[in-house]
Amino acid sequence: MIVMLSEKGEDMLSIARRTAAGAAILLIMPLAVWVSGWMWQPGQNATWLKTLYWITETVTQPWGIITHVILCAWFLWCLRFRLRAALMLFAILGGAILIGQGVKSWVKDHVQEPRPFVVWLEKAHHVPVDEFYNLKRKDRGALVKEQLAEQQDIPKFLRKHWQKETGFAFPSGHTMFAASWALLGVGLLWPRRRTVTIAILLVWATGVMGSRLLLGMHWPRDLVVATLISWLLVTLATWLAERICGPLTPPPVEEEEIAERDQSDA
């Protein structure tokens, strides 16, 4: 059933179509990798891995909190709601991200899929996956450190990253964070024609997703399912934002700014 809003608002179906288009863009890379049959193996170029590591760190605590605050502030500026509506939007944005992370944790605990680097540890260092995950998190990190102490083909920063990230793989929490923000951009900012912001968010989210694959943290299916969950949550969050905070379409004054921006871009 389509939930209709005020005359100035969009219905749920229109919002879902828009965010689905964004989700489809994000799914291109992981689906292509999945279909290709690519499997992660250690030994990639250290400089390239370091770049990917810093991309993934934009989502990892504490940097992820800073990213969240910056994006919230930018969205509030772009939408230019009044104070009460802005505070409500801030709560909706934060709620969408937190609920997504909660869903991720629940699914991880029930599916219990091992990370690619843990599967590799079993093959290369004879560390059984079941025994690894039966350990407490602190002990898992210590085991990774011990087993890879002499593994010079794996950069030190990546070994430390693995020591911290010893949880289950499915779905990808980093992907859910980045994909949620990218899709919130599509859902909330497209009516304001913030195309540059949307493009940057989509590229950034795809970069985060790729980094999770190449750092040995996730399988392609982890990224696909995380993106689909994000799409569902963001579609609802966008609909709530318009219903509670007001129409996403710009007022007449801002329409003039958009027209001027479009002319300068052309």
Q: Which residues fall in each region the model found?
A:
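Hydrophobic alpha-helical bundle signature of multipass membrane enzymes
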Residues: I2-G167, S180-L189, T195, A199
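Membrane-embedded catalytic cores of phosphoryl/pyrophosphoryl-handling enzymes
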Residues: D11-L13, R140-A266
